[in-house]
Amino acid sequence: MTQRVETNIVFNHGYNFYRSDKKILIEQGGSRSGKTYNILLWIIFDYCSIYSDKIITVTRRVMPSLRATVMRDFFEILRKYELYDEENHNKSNSEYILNNNIIEFISLDQPAKIRGRKRNLLFINEANEIDWESWQQLIFRTEGKIVIDYNPSESTHWIYDKVLVRDDVIFYKTTYKDNPFIDKGLITELERLKETDEEYWQVFGLGERALSRTQI
């Protein structure tokens, strides 16, 4: 996999994280910052090009959301770079084999899979949607590293209180300004929030934690 790949800064975050001694990479960010897409690019073009015979779990709270977002992006990337091979795609199990690595897509409404086999790399998309118990079940079965991304749309959350404070975490915050590929029309719509909705601008424009009601 030596072809030219268009990435943004989030890809570099993943590259540097995996070569560090930290266990958890946290990608907090606003809308359209390219978090999810570039984490997938990193998994495909860095992690899977170096390693083989690994199990990579990509998860979100419910399967419809998983299919409509991160799964769609994953297969779009494979097809864009001519890596997709239908023989490697187990559609019934939502798995794909890449360089002898198994990439499995599971949702938290599949408890048997959550409590199933161990994995080497875990990516939780929109991690703020899941509860503390689900997080614990996932990390107990992850032998390697963990990547999470989310929009900080809650003013309080276990991620802030129990994960960000760990000493084995690398934290990044990104916004639409970190994504050179964003459509100009989307930039205009996001920047309208400055005048129309301060709370939405805080979260989806600036990638900052939502204000509590006492702060508004």
Question: Where are the language model's segments positioned?
Answer:
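Pre-P-loop entry segment of helicase/translocase ATPase cores
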Residues: 1-24
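Walker A (P-loop) phosphate-binding loop of P-loop NTPases
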Residues: 32-33
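Conserved RecA-like ASCE P-loop NTPase motor core of nucleic-acid helicases/translocases
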Residues: 54-66
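Walker A/P-loop NTP-binding motif
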Residues: 36-52
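Signature of the SF2 helicase/ATPase Hel1-core->accessory helical subdomain module
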Residues: 128-179
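Inter-Walker segment of RecA-like/P-loop motor cores
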Residues: 64-120, 207-209
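ATPase catalytic-site recognition across NTP-hydrolyzing enzymes
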Residues: 179-216
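Short hydrophobic/aromatic beta-strand immediately N-terminal to the Walker A/P-loop
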Residues: 25-28, 148
